[in-house]
């Protein structure tokens, strides 16, 4: 008997040519006697054997487990064949258990797309360029036939699996088989819309509003509120190339700075606040209304109100050009920015630029900023630019702006004011800071006070961190309804607007524009507002 050894896995026996077989120690067994092209009537020589093509014999690939998954295999003609017996390859030190691959019901698979599968166990490393194989996936909608290479499959995270993972071989060892991440095909309900408004009634117990004895330094730290995350239309919002921060389109702009990461049109919710008797208590102190309503001492109330009024106008006159701008009041600080040529103001002498002498008359200075003379308008724009710079520089440190002697007086006055008003401002700041901490929400202030005194109020009451100067509007000349329209033009119709105030004017303006209105008339209203914000009802 002559025996010719062809390869470690192929043996040719001269006595049994009619029973010639190819034995393959791999995951599948191939038998030539069962294939076409081999007959018993004509014995083949060895030379003929190797010159004859066999369409079903595939070249051996190292360590491939093509049929070792224990799954039913389908041929290209979608005909079911008997599964082959799984033999572990010699180089593989472990066996792969048989399991089914379950598809998620919420995913739609189509030929040519990789399925979103969750493989609990890992696979042996396949050579680069492995041809796709056909596999079967069991799902509620039947079977899916698709030639998907493992290189195109993306796996779910463990949180999306409804069956335990196979331990021992993490998928991170085979990055070429799995995508880097998987984005779920659904969106959480919390990101689509806020929680529905609660129908429960707020029952608030009146707590004692006693201010403990504190030093001036500790009180100063208390009123310096923390800065929330930088949000769109908050920190650093200045002039934009095409649309000013007040919402008006600009035909020309001499100055532009880097815009915020997200534009005004990406704001989702805008809270429009009134100032007096909503956020702060000021006018009712001067009239004695607050003292009579809450049983406080009227003399003390009027005294504190007058002292605060003096500090407000002193700051406005000394540092914010109120003497120059009182008769040229603007609705927004950027209303005349288009007349600014961007000149450096570090050495500019405002007291000697002839601003008053060049003005033909105060009655010609309109609210829209229209005034005869290009040179005069440029000087007016310079003043508003300097006001903006001063506000942004000292909005968190007004004590550094007014100086040390006045700073001590201001701290003492603030402490007396909070004690008299039962921490009214503290409650307001809690709600304002909650809104300011949200990434796509913004606080906007609309007040009937002139713009320059309003800015001084905001600084002295410690509100600069929650109200950027671009978000402050004066309704002295046009009314609040007109300001609401400008705000809606600026932030767009898709945003949700909530008006918070105590007066009839803002309530009527909110009703006309279909804006929700939250009335503030007492401490309980502020507490309820803060509670609704904490629960994200607003």
Curated annotation (Swiss-Prot):
Binds 1 Mg(2+) ion per subunit. Mg(2+) binds at residues 274, 276, 502. One of its GO terms (biological process) is extrinsic apoptotic signaling pathway in absence of ligand. Residues 234-249 have a biased composition (Basic and acidic residues). Keywords: Activator, Chromatin regulator, Cytoplasm, Developmental protein, DNA damage, DNA repair, Hydrolase, Magnesium, Metal-binding, Nucleus, Protein phosphatase, Transcription, Transcription regulation. Disulfide bonds: none annotated. It is an enzyme of class 3 (hydrolase). InterPro entries: EYA, EYA_dom, EYA_dom_metazoan, EYA_dom_sf, HAD-like_sf. GO terms for molecular function: histone H2AXY142 phosphatase activity; magnesium ion binding; protein tyrosine phosphatase activity. Highest expression in muscle with lower levels in kidney, placenta, pancreas, brain and heart. It catalyses: O-phospho-L-tyrosyl-[protein] + H2O = L-tyrosyl-[protein] + phosphate. It is found in: Cytoplasm; Nucleus. CDD domains: HAD_Eya. Gene3D superfamilies: 3.40.50.12350. Its EC number is 3.1.3.48. One of its GO terms (cellular component) is nucleus. Residues 209-230 have a biased composition (Polar residues). Its cofactor is Mg(2+). It comes from the Eukaryota. The active site is at 274 (nucleophile), 276 (proton donor). Pfam families: Hydrolase. SUPFAM superfamilies: HAD-like. NCBIfam families: EYA-cons_domain. Belongs to the HAD-like hydrolase superfamily. EYA family. Functions both as protein phosphatase and as transcriptional coactivator for SIX1, and probably also for SIX2, SIX4 and SIX5. Tyrosine phosphatase that dephosphorylates 'Tyr-142' of histone H2AX (H2AXY142ph) and promotes efficient DNA repair via the recruitment of DNA repair complexes containing MDC1. 'Tyr-142' phosphorylation of histone H2AX plays a central role in DNA repair and acts as a mark that distinguishes between apoptotic and repair responses to genotoxic stress. Its function as histone phosphatase may contribute to its function in transcription regulation during organogenesis. This is Protein phosphatase EYA2.
């Amino acid at each position: 008997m002559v025996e010719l050894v062809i390869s470690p896995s192929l043996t040719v026996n001269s006595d049994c040519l009619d029973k010639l077989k190819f034995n393959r120690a791999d995951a599948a067994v191939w038998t030539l006697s069962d294939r076409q092209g081999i007959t018993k009537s004509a014995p083949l020589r060895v030379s003929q054997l190797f010159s004859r093509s066999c369409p079903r014999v595939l070249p051996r690939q190292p360590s491939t487990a093509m049929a070792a998954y224990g799954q039913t295999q389908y041929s290209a003609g979608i005909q079911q064949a008997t599964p082959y017996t799984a033999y572990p390859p010699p180089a593989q030190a472990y066996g792969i258990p048989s399991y089914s691959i379950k598809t998620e019901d919420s995913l739609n698979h189509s030929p040519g797309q990789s399925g979103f599968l969750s493989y609990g166990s890992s696979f042996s490393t396949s050579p680069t360029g492995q041809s796709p194989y056909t596999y079967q996936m069991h799902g509620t909608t039947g079977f899916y036939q698709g030639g998907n290479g493992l290189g195109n499959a993306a796996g779910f995270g463990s949180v999306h699996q409804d069956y335990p993972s196979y331990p021992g071989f993490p998928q991170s060892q085979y990055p070429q088989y799995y995508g880097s991440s998987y984005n779920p095909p659904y969106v959480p309900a919390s990101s689509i819309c806020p929680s529905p408004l609660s129908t429960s009634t707020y029952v608030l117990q009146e707590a004692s509003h006693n201010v403990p004895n504190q030093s001036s330094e500790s009180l100063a730290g208390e009123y310096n509120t923390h800065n929330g995350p930088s949000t769109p239309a908050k920190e650093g919002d200045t002039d934009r190339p095409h649309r000013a921060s007040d919402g008006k389109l600009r035909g020309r702009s001499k100055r532009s700075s880097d815009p915020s990461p997200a534009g005004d049109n990406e704001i989702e919710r805008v809270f429009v606040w009134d100032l007096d008797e909503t956020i702060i208590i000021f006018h009712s102190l001067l009239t004695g209304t607050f003292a009579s309503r809450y049983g406080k001492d009227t003399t003390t109330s009027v005294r504190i109100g007058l002292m605060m009024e003096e500090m407000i106008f002193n700051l406005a006159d000394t540092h914010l050009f109120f003497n120059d701008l009182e008769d040229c009041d603007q609705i927004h600080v950027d209303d005349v920015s288009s007349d600014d040529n961007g000149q450096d103001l570090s050495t500019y002498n405002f007291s000697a630029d002839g601003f008053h002498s060049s003005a033909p008359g105060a009655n010609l200075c309109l609210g829209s900023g229209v005034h005869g003379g290009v040179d005069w308008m440029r000087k007016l724009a310079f003043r508003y630019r300097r006001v903006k710079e001063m506000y942004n520089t000292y909005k968190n440190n007004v004590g550094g702006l007014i100086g040390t002697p006045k700073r001590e007086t201001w701290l003492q006055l603030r402490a007396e004011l909070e004690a008299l008003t039962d921490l009214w401002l503290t409650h307001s700041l809690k709600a304002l800071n909650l809104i300011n901490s949200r990434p796509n929400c913004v606080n906007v202030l609309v007040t009937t006070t002139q713009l320059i005194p309003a800015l001084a109020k905001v600084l002295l009451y410690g509100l600069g961190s929650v109200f950027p100067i671009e978000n402050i509007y004066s309704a002295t000349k046009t009314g609040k309804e007109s300001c609401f329209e400008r705000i809606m033009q600026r932030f767009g119709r898709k945003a949700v607007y909530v008006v918070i105030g105590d007066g009839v004017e803002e309530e009527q303006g909110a009703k006309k524009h279909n804006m929700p209105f939250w009335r503030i008339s007492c401490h309980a209203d502020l507490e309820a507002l803060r509670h609704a914000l904490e629960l994200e009802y607003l």
